Amino acid sequence: MRRTRAIGGALLAGLVLAALLAPVLTPHAPLRQFTDYENAPPMRPHLVSADGRIVWPFVRPVKLVDRLERRFEATRDEVPIRWFNSGVLLSIDESRGPWFPLGTDPLGRDVFSRLLFGARLSLSVAFVASLGALLAGLAVGGVAGFAGGRLETALMAVADFVLVLPAIYVVLALRAAMPLVLSVPQVFWTLSLVLAAAGWPVVARGVRGIIAA
């Protein structure tokens, strides 16, 4: 059991570290579009050259051979992977073709870059929401515990009401009440506030119980 937890913790720490180091680990900006490489396949590194020799890791760029079917084929060109070039851990000479470790999406954006930068945003939402829930829970639980009486009863009734609400339906209801198109900062703060609003009652009840004891 301890070994399983250690492995899980190491994997989680690795994912968090990769997300935090996204600007160094990703070969492209997450919003950069490659119009000639829409839905391009992943381009994995190779260690064995065409003549069977073990060489420095290289990548075979892909080219679009059928624009109608969006079909790509790997070229015979062997482009070596470079270390720490232009502030990026791993990259290739883009004059010989771009490198997409996990391919591209329908808009021609690098999936690997978007995955790591998206993870940063998700981790930020989780951190801000947890901090908001903690602060709100401490405030409400502290007031309820020290005040007592009807105020305590009212605050804990609100906390109980929030606890019984399915969080997913609260998120959907709030999203439906907002404009159809939201900017990234608006989405970030909306998710953070909703998740904080769903999490503060647990903290509040715990703080109130500690004070009352």
Give the role of each language-model region.
Residues M1-L134, L138, G142-V143:
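Gly/Trp-centered helix-boundary motif
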